[in-house]
From Swiss-Prot:
EC number of the protein: 2.4.3.3
Localization per Swiss-Prot or TrEMBL: Golgi apparatus membrane
Pathway: Protein modification; protein glycosylation
Residues of this chain annotated as glycosylated in UniProt: N300, N311, N331, N375, N460
Purpose: Protein sialyltransferase specifically expressed in goblet cells that plays a key role in intestinal host-commensal homeostasis. Conjugates sialic acid with an alpha-2-6 linkage to N-acetylgalactosamine (GalNAc) glycan chains linked to serine or threonine in glycoproteins. Catalyzes the formation of the sialyl-Tn (S-Tn) antigen, an antigen found in intestinal goblet cells, as well as ulcerative colitis (UC) and various cancers.
Keywords for the protein's UniProt record, in alphabetical order: Disease variant, Disulfide bond, Glycoprotein, Glycosyltransferase, Golgi apparatus, Membrane, Signal-anchor, Transferase, Transmembrane, Transmembrane helix
InterPro entries: Glyco_trans_29, GT29-like_sf
Spans within the Cytoplasmic topological domain: 1-14
Protein name: Alpha-N-acetylgalactosaminide alpha-2,6-sialyltransferase 1
UniProt GO molecular function: alpha-N-acetylgalactosaminide alpha-2,6-sialyltransferase activity; sialyltransferase activity
Gene: ST6GALNAC1
Gene Ontology terms: biological process: host-mediated regulation of intestinal microbiota composition; oligosaccharide biosynthetic process; protein glycosylation
Amino acid sequence: MRSCLWRCRHLSQGVQWSLLLAVLVFFLFALPSFIKEPQTKPSRHQRTENIKERSLQSLAKPKSQAPTRARRTTIYAEPVPENNALNTQTQPKAHTTGDRGKEANQAPPEEQDKVPHTAQRAAWKSPEKEKTMVNTLSPRGQDAGMASGRTEAQSWKSQDTKTTQGNGGQTRKLTASRTVSEKHQGKAATTAKTLIPKSQHRMLAPTGAVSTRTRQKGVTTAVIPPKEKKPQATPPPAPFQSPTTQRNQRLKAANFKSEPRWDFEEKYSFEIGGLQTTCPDSVKIKASKSLWLQKLFLPNLTLFLDSRHFNQSEWDRLEHFAPPFGFMELNYSLVQKVVTRFPPVPQQQLLLASLPAGSLRCITCAVVGNGGILNNSHMGQEIDSHDYVFRLSGALIKGYEQDVGTRTSFYGFTAFSLTQSLLILGNRGFKNVPLGKDVRYLHFLEGTRDYEWLEALLMNQTVMSKNLFWFRHRPQEAFREALHMDRYLLLHPDFLRYMKNRFLRSKTLDGAHWRIYRPTTGALLLLTALQLCDQVSAYGFITEGHERFSDHYYDTSWKRLIFYINHDFKLEREVWKRLHDEGIIRLYQRPGPGTAKAKN
C-alpha cells in the first residue's frame, strides 16, 4: 500500500486530479446500490396486502389474550326497573360474544344498511394506530390491560336505572351503551358494547347501532374512563349481521343446568299513570294490607305486549329469559314481524277503563278452569252472575251449562292448548273459540310455535309449522273469520315472569328440567284476572281432595289427574288455598268425601 502511495507522488499533479475525479464518480454511481432508501409509499396492492395481514394479526391476537377460566360469562341489560327483594343468587353461565358482539345484528331495521359500512371503515383504517376500549368481566376477571378487536362487557353488579321498581317505586339508572375510543388516532377506532360497573355511576344512553366518532341521529357515544383499569377479557370477534339474521352464538337454555338468575331478574315493565281502582274492597286494596301479599303483588305492571312495547332494548333484556318469560332462542325477525302488527293497548287496565268516571263500582270476575270438580257442581248460574267470565283452552259449554255457565268475556289459550282442544273436543262441539263481539282473547306465548301460529293468523295462511303438525288449517278458521286485532291480546313476558317469580316459583327450576317448566294456562289466567278485576272467584281449579274428581269436567269417563313435570300442581294448589284464606279470591271447593261421577 505504501509503495502505491509512493508511486502516486511521482505522478504529475494533473494525473493525480484525474484519478481522484474518477474515484469520486465511481463512488457516486456505486453508492446507491449499497444504500437503498426504504419505500415509504407502497403501491395500492402492497397497501391492501399489508392491511389484510395486520387485520388477521389483530383478529388472532384476542385469542391469545383471552382468560383461561373454565367458563366465561357475561350479562347485558337495557334500562329496566331495579331489583327487588326476591332477587336471588346470580348464576348465569354464558353470554357469548357472537351474541352481544354483533351490534349490527341487533340494530334497528332502519339502520341495518349503515352498520356494516361504518364498522368496516373503522376496522380497515390504520390498524397499527388503533386505540381500543376494554370492557369489564366478572369480579373474578383477569389482570387489567388493553385488548384489541371488538370487545364485550359485563357487570355482575346491578346498574342504576331510571325507571319504576317493584313496590317501592324507586328510581334508578341501569345503563348499557356501545362506546368508542376517547381519541381517534390515525382516524381509526374500534367499537365495543359495555355495561358500566356500579362503582362508576355513569349515566350513558343505550344505542341501537354501532357507535363511531361521528355523532349520528339517535346514537349516543361515551368513553370508558382511562384512569380506571378493570379486569377484562378479549373474546374472539364476530362478523356483523342484521337483526333479521339468526345468530350463530347466543344464549342457549342447554348451557344452563338450572334456571339462570340474573341481577335484573326482578325488573319489569310498568305502566306509569295507569288507572286506579276506586273499589274499597278491591283485590289491590286487600293485597296492600296483607303482610304476605304486599311484598309480592305489583298493581301497575305492563300486562300486554304490543308494537309500543317491542324495541331493541327490550329484545336485548328479554333475550336473557326463556319463553314464555322472555325471548331466549327465539327468532328476532319472526317476533318483530308478529308483535309490531299489534296496535298499542290504550289502557292496561281494560276493565277499569270501561267504567264511568268516578264510579265506585267493584268489577267482579269469575275464572272458570276445566277441573273435574265442576262436574255436577251446578255453579253455572253463579258463574254467569259475575261482570266478566274468564275461560280457557277446551272451554266446552254445550251440555254443561248448569255446571259452567254460558257467558264468556275472556278466553285464554296457547297455540298448543287451542289446537289440541280443537282436535280432541271438535267432535263434541268445540269447533271454534268462544265467539262474540265483546269477547277478548288472551294469548299466552309459550315459544316459537305460538309466534308461528300468529304469523299464519296475521297472514291468513295455513299453519305449516312442524311444531303444530297436527293442525294444518288457517288459524282464522278457529275464529270464524271474525277476528278483530284490538280484541286479541298478547301477554307480556315480563308479566308472565312476575307470576312465576313471585307466586309459582317451582323447585323444578333449580334442576335439569328447568326449561320445560311453566305454570298451567289456568294459573296464568287466574293471576291475570287478579290484575284486571276487583273481586275474583275461581272455579274448576285444583284444591285439596282433588283425587276425588276426574281430570276435566267434560270427561265421559273418570280420569286421574296426572302431575306432569312441566307443571307444579301441588304448588298451585297451595297458592290458591293461601289466596283464598287471605280473602284475596274466593276458591270454589267441593265439600264431601264422595267422588263426582262424570256425565255420559
